[in-house]
């Protein structure tokens, strides 16, 4: 029965076609429904600073919803990725951009644009940019300030910016009356691994302007710090024949003839109380002395306040307190 066999083969062939079509529809591989891959172009980097940049590019989504991100890092292996963002579903090229942060100064970075759509993932060409150097800057403080005459102090600070570590710097001083200009004090020193430094200073005899500057190029100069020198004062007590009175005497270094001494009673939690005073008199080429009587109204801790009048070479200071009973 030839007709019967031909009909049976035709039915089987038709069934096979239907089953194949169903399989393609289930797997999403129907030729008519296949999505084209997006096209991408990695653009240039803009707004590049020492710690951030904006990466740019173009994405053509080919009419289907597409996302994009940027890969970036210090090598062609990248290692970092920006957040996934929508690029739309246009049939034309669309400009995209993302800002990245946390970058290192003076460093070359690789980056590329990557688009992700139903038709696949496509990466653009690799491009590079270099972050700029952080300009060097100096900050410093002196401690203690004021410093007591004859005592050491320190000039400490930081050289910040690219290349601030292990950099040669020098300390410079311009002593009172600040007309001689800045002169280098001591030898150059190297900053530490994080740009920090500390200059010890012993022997400053008058108020001085201080600064730190780099050695070589680029020349970077710190703000000026005024280091003041307080007179050194001592005070002692001696009994007198006059009832209710004591004699307070002491020295002032350096010599400050004409300065005024005030005797003060100290009261915890309250302002000091003036109890009289006396002028400072010349004693030697390097020190002055004072001596004066004070009425002792009550026992307690007393100190001497030395008010200098040398037109700015030194600043006033207190003696250490003494107990008078």
What residue spans do the PLM features occupy?
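Low-complexity, Ser/Thr/Pro-rich intrinsically disordered linker/stalk segments at domain junctions
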Residues: 107-108, 115, 132-325
């Amino acid at each position: 029965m030839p007709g019967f066999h031909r009909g049976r083969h035709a039915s089987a062939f038709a069934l096979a076609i239907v089953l194949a079509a169903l399989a393609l529809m289930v797997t999403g591989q129907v030729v008519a429904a296949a999505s084209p891959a997006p096209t991408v172009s990695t653009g240039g980097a803009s707004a590049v600073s020492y710690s951030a940049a904006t990466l740019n590019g173009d994405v053509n989504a080919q009419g289907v919803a597409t996302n994009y991100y940027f890969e970036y890092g210090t090598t062609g292996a990248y290692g970092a990725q920006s957040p996934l963002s929508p690029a739309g579903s246009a049939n034309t090229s669309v400009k995209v951009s993302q800002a990245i942060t946390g970058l290192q100064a003076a460093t070359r970075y690789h980056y590329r644009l990557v688009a992700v759509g139903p038709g696949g993932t496509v990466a653009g060409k690799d491009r590079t940019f270099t972050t700029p150097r952080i300009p060097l800057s100096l900050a410093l403080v002196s401690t203690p300030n004021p410093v007591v005459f004859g005592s050491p102090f320190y000039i400490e600070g930081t050289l910040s910016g690219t290349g601030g570590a292990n950099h040669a710097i020098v300390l410079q001083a311009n002593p009172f009356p600040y007309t001689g200009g800045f002169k280098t004090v001591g030898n150059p020193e190297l900053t530490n691994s994080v740009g920090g430094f500390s200059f010890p200073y012993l022997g400053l005899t008058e108020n001085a302007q201080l600064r730190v500057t780099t050695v070589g190029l680029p020349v970077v100069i710190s703000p000026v710090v005024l280091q003041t020198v307080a007179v050194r004062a001592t005070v002692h007590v001696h009994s007198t024949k006059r009832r209710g009175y004591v004699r307070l005497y002491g020295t002032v270094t350096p010599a400050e003839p004409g300065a005024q001494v005030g005797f003060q009673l100290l009261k915890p939690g309250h302002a000091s109380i003036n109890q009289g005073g006396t002028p400072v008199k010349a004693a030697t080429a390097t020190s002055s002395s004072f001596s004066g009587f004070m009425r002792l109204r009550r026992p307690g801790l007393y100190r001497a306040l030395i008010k200098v009048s040398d037109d700015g070479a030194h600043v006033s200071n207190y003696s250490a307190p003494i107990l008078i009973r």
